């Protein structure tokens, strides 16, 4: 299975990674084009475009200015250890063994507004450029136009290399829109996670994000090769509910947290 997840806004470039093993992003030429566009923006432009505070806008203007390949362990960090957020809390990369890292490299990909598609151990430098940003660029008026079919082609390439034809979408809608579903060369599975609140099961964003990370880790660890095997997922109290599920959207429920 090939798992797709979103990146995180929160970054950690302070703590050292647990391994020196690293790879390079495959779409750095395109990233450089976007950096060149972003360097034309003033902090005020960035604040307006990204709807962020002046402080965060200034930080990201500096990041765009400082962004500079080649990436090394001195000026960059592996994506899976740099991203911090609910999905990454669930994934818990800081406790990966060497064999689990190798499995992650094969079965996990991170969608990114700046880098397109990342392997977990790809080095990245700090940035903030969400996929939904309406950044005018040489290809159009937003990042979906910029990336076009490029990300989809890389997803298909990774899918072939990992051995089966199942893509598990654990990314947000904003990021998954960068993938052309009609061009995917495999079957697409989009798990749904619902938590019980006041007697009703519904998708609760915070819990669902962490659950996506838990499932990504489960796939990396257990290497399922069928949707049926995926339904055995049972981390942190979730369980498969056949009645609410469809063949392409397995539903996992969790009873109310006490």
From Swiss-Prot:
Pfam families: H2O2_YaaD (PF03883)
GO cellular component: cytosol
GO biological process per UniProt: response to hydroperoxide
NCBIfam families xrefs: PRK02101.1-1, PRK02101.1-3
Family of this protein: Belongs to the UPF0246 family.
Name by which UniProt lists this protein: UPF0246 protein Sfri_2896
């Amino acid at each position: 299975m090939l798992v797709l997840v979103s990146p995180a806004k929160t970054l950690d470039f302070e703590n050292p990674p647990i391994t020196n093993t690293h790879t390079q992003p495959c779409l750095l030429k395109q990233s450089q084009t976007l950096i060149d566009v972003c360097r034309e923006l003033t902090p005020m432009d960035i604040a307006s475009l990204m709807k962020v505070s002046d402080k965060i806008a200034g930080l990201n203007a500096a990041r765009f200015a400082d962004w500079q390949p080649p990436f090394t362990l001195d000026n960059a960090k592996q994506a899976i250890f740099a991203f911090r957020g609910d999905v990454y809390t669930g994934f818990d990369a800081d406790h990966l063994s060497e064999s689990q890292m190798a499995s992650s490299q094969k079965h996990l990909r991170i969608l990114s507004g700046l880098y397109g598609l990342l392997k977990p151990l790809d080095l990245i430098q700090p940035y903030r450029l969400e996929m939904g940003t309406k950044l005018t660029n040489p290809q159009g008026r937003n990042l979906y136009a910029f990336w076009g079919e490029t990300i989809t082609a890389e997803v298909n390439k990774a899918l072939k290399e990992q051995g089966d034809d199942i893509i598990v979408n654990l990314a947000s809608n904003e990021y998954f829109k960068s993938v052309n579903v009609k061009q995917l060369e495999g079957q697409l599975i989009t798990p749904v996670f619902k938590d019980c609140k006041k007697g009703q099961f519904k998708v609760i964003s915070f819990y669902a994000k962490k659950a996506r990370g838990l499932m990504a880790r489960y796939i990396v660890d257990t290497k399922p090769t069928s949707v049926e095997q995926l339904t055995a997922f049972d981390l942190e109290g979730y369980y498969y509910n056949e009645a609410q599920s469809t063949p392409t959207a397995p539903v996992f429920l969790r009873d109310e947290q006490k």
